[in-house]
């Protein structure tokens, strides 16, 4: 059984290193332009060597792509979670948006001034909605309190998405921007009702 424990430790260490690499990259991208960041910069910031970096990513573009995809999946999951049960045309917007972002180079997405704010809000909303899933069956009264915050965060995220779409697509997707803004406004009303 010793080899099994060894594999588990190795896996945990690998996960921690991967998180350190991502954190280092996100810190660096706020300090300098993404095109000026090197693998040596990331390795230094994450306190690893270049060989260790290459065990986790083939290149900076590979790292950016995986981080972007991860964010898109989280975004899709948490938005659909907080939309229950009143789902209208919103899934179509999410489908288009996630498809568009999936096909857009990660560097372009991360260079948007709205990206970091979205990351923060989606991460917190994702954790809140997961916690709500686990706890509501034990404490039904917790749902309003937890989902108030989650819906508030998603409302802010939708405003950021609408702004990002306006910034990147210059009027080509005006209808989608309008839908996002309407959904954000609706979520704000939901929050107000839950707070009454």
Task: Go through each PLM region and give its residues.
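Helical hydrophobic small-molecule/effector-binding pocket
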Residues: 84-132
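Short, Lys/Arg-enriched N-terminal segments with co-localized hydrophobic residues
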Residues: 1-8
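N-terminal positioning helix adjacent to the helix-turn-helix/winged-helix DNA-binding module
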Residues: 10, 16-24, 145
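Residues within the helices of the helix-turn-helix
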Residues: 40
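Secondary-structure edge/capping motif, primarily at the C-terminal ends of alpha-helices
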Residues: 78-82, 104-109, 133-137, 164-168, ...
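C-terminal peripheral helix-coil segments that are non-catalytic and often amphipathic
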Residues: 2, 163-196
């Amino acid at each position: 059984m010793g080899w099994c424990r060894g594999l588990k430790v190795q896996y945990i260490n690998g996960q921690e290193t991967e998180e350190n690499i991502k954190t280092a990259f996100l810190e660096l991208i706020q300090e300098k332009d993404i095109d000026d960041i090197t693998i040596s910069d990331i390795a230094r910031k994450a306190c690893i060597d270049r060989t260790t970096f290459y065990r986790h990513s083939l290149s900076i573009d590979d790292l950016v792509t995986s981080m972007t995809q991860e964010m898109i999946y989280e975004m899709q999951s948490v938005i659909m979670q907080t939309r229950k049960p009143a789902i209208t045309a919103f899934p179509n917007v999410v489908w288009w948006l996630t498809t568009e972002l999936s096909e857009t180079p990660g560097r372009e997405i991360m260079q948007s001034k709205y990206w970091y704010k979205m990351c923060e809000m989606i991460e917190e909303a994702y954790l809140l909605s997961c916690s709500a899933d686990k706890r509501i069956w034990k404490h039904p009264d917790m749902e309003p309190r937890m989902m108030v915050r989650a819906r508030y965060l998603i409302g802010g995220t939708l405003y950021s998405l609408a702004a990002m779409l306006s910034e990147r697509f210059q009027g080509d997707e005006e209808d989608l921007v309008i839908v996002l803004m309407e959904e954000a406004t609706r979520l704000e009303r939901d929050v107000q009702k839950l707070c009454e």
